[in-house]
Curated annotation (Swiss-Prot):
Positions in coiled-coil regions: none
Listed PANTHER family: PYRUVATE, PHOSPHATE DIKINASE REGULATORY PROTEIN 1, CHLOROPLASTIC
EC number: 2.7.11.33, 2.7.4.28
Keywords: Kinase, Nucleotide-binding, Serine/threonine-protein kinase, Transferase
Protein name listed in UniProt: Putative phosphoenolpyruvate synthase regulatory protein
A single MF term (Gene Ontology): ADP binding
Keyword set includes Transferase: yes
Length: 271
């Protein structure tokens, strides 16, 4: 049985889980994740303590617990378990308080905006924009885009656009390059006025064929030779038009998004 890992937070737990994933990915080991969000009272802390100790009995080994609990009383309750407890606030906040000679706010949920903040509204607006401009659905207001992703079908444009919108508040449109564009040897007409905003995604033809076969098995659309043709033509077009691009084959969405932000010189806060 894989080791049990608890993600305990007084908020959504997104911060703690992201940190835990980064640390645990360094080990060639599968883990069983148990998320325990909104532990915002001592009663909930005691209930969490009980869950952790039950896991010790069931697994026959100590679980690992990542916590981001601001309330010291709740934190001490969870630390009373027999688990390996990794307290992110104690690890990072206390040394920073000493270094900065300041006391932190110790307020719960400060890492995520409320629905009435300007940052939150901007992020929702970016998500709506990206959804409305997914896969070339709309050509309206393309001038408002921060970036326009181009590439063949199934090269990773949609998930990257949505990640940029959700994580960074970037208005990311995406537009497919199709065989008709390659036959004409020109970019789609709606994109011609926005070259400076374009960024291309490519992908290994064999991997593209595998992905497309999941959607349309045995079709010309998914055939290896067709995928090679489309990728070769798309990359040639991007080079010809001076569009920066990268291969998404061996990159995570996070890596792709970070590279795009660097290349197009977009400086956005992560929410």
């Amino acid at each position: 049985m894989p080791p049990t890992v608890f993600i305990v937070s007084d908020g959504t737990g997104i911060t703690a889980e992201t940190f835990a994933h980064s640390i645990l990915s360094q080990f060639d080991q599968k883990f069983r994740l148990v998320r325990v969000p909104f532990v915002d009272s001592t009663e909930k802390a005691y209930a969490t303590l009980e869950k952790i100790n039950e896991a010790i009995v069931q697994d026959g080994r100590r679980p690992i617990v990542f916590t981001t609990l601001v309330d010291s009383a709740s934190n001490q309750i969870v630390k009373g378990s027999n688990a390996l407890v990794l307290d992110m606030f104690q690890t990072f906040v206390e040394p920073l308080e000493q270094e900065l000679e300041l006391k932190s706010s110790h307020a719960m949920g400060r890492g995520h905006q409320n629905a009435d903040t300007e940052e939150y509204k901007n992020r929702i607006e970016a998500i709506n924009f990206s959804l409305a401009h997914d896969d070339g659905q709309s050509n309206r207001n393309l001038a408002d885009a921060d970036v326009i992703l181009v590439g063949v079908s199934r090269s990773g444009k949609t998930p990257t656009s949505l990640y940029l919108a959700m994580q960074y508040g970037v208005k990311a449109a995406n537009y497919p390059l199709i065989p008709e564009d390659f036959e004409r040897g020109k970019l789609p007409t709606p994109l011609l006025a926005h070259r400076q905003k374009m960024f291309g995604l490519s992908i290994d033809p064999q991997r593209l064929s595998e992905i497309r076969n999941e959607r349309r098995p045995g079709s010309k659309y998914a055939a290896p030779e067709n995928c090679r043709y489309e990728i070769n033509e798309a990359e040639a077009m991007m080079r010809r038009e001076g569009i920066k691009w990268l291969s998404s084959t061996h990159k995570s969405i996070e890596e792709i998004a970070t590279t795009i932000l660097q290349e197009i010189k977009l400086d956005r806060p992560s929410y």
